[in-house]
Regions:
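Redox-cofactor binding/interface segments in oxidoreductases and associated redox assembly factors
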Residues: 80-84
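ATP-dependent carboxylate-amine ligase catalytic core
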Residues: 3-10, 24, 32, 49-56, ...
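Glycine-rich, highly charged phosphate/nucleotide-binding loops
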Residues: 55-72, 93-94
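Extreme N-terminal, non-catalytic leader segments
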Residues: 87-91, 97-149
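Walker A (P-loop) phosphate-binding motif
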Residues: 135-181
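Flexible, glycine/proline-enriched loop segments at strand-loop-helix junctions
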Residues: 107-112, 151-159, 198-199
């Protein structure tokens, strides 16, 4: 796994043909809750519009462009795969876009099961689902943690676990409580910039 050392990213979000749909939850989550800047969204079916025109409830705005060349004019540091496409593998056109981005020195960030680092050897790729090699075995040490812990779980994907957790955290902070979001899902890790999304 190669991961850029820059503490802050400026994202171009690749969501071709899907940005306005629920399946683009990684794109939506990063825009709504992420700390990093959004340079633009790439979806040629909505090119010329803005995020606020299409999904005003996300609370942040960015231009929507149709091509990588247009995206590069907004000086992104990273290109995010903004959804998991049906079938779990990226279409060839997306791979071509990612290759061109990598060749331009743009970091690729992906939460897919499909590992992208082997596809782009020597290029900056953050495969979010690639677990770090130093995860210890369960020891029970967590039972001794002083602060209260709220665990959110669900029986399926894309049902609101992350959204509920982040809204609870937001409300708690609004009441002056000290809170920390510990991400475990791929979108959560991208939003928080750390954690573990180790689902193989």
């Amino acid at each position: 796994m190669i991961r850029a050392e820059a503490p802050e990213r400026r994202y171009a979000i690749l969501a071709e043909g899907w940005f306005a749909r629920n399946h683009a939850k990684t794109a939506h989550g990063l825009i709504r809750y992420g700390r990093d800047e959004i340079a633009c969204v790439m979806d040629s079916t909505l090119a010329g519009k803005r995020v606020s025109d299409v999904l005003p409830d996300l609370g942040r705005d960015a231009p929507i462009v149709g091509t990588l060349d247009e995206a590069l004019t907004f000086s992104p540091t990273s290109i995010l795969v903004g959804l998991a496409p049906p079938g779990g593998r990226l279409p060839e056109e997306w791979m071509e876009t990612l290759k061109a981005a990598a060749d331009a020195g743009i970091e690729i960030v992906s939460g897919l099961h499909q590992r992208l680092a082997p596809e782009f050897p020597g290029k900056p790729v953050w495969d979010v689902r690639e677990p770090p090699g130093d995860i210890p075995l369960f020891s029970g040490e967590g039972f001794g943690v002083g602060p209260k812990v709220a665990l959110t779980v669900g029986t399926d994907s894309a049902i609101g676990k992350m959204t509920a957790t982040l809204e609870i955290e937001r409300a708690a902070r609004g009441q002056g409580l000290s809170t920390e979001f510990v991400p475990t899902g791929q979108t959560d890790v991208i939003i928080g910039g750390g954690g573990s999304a180790s689902t193989p």
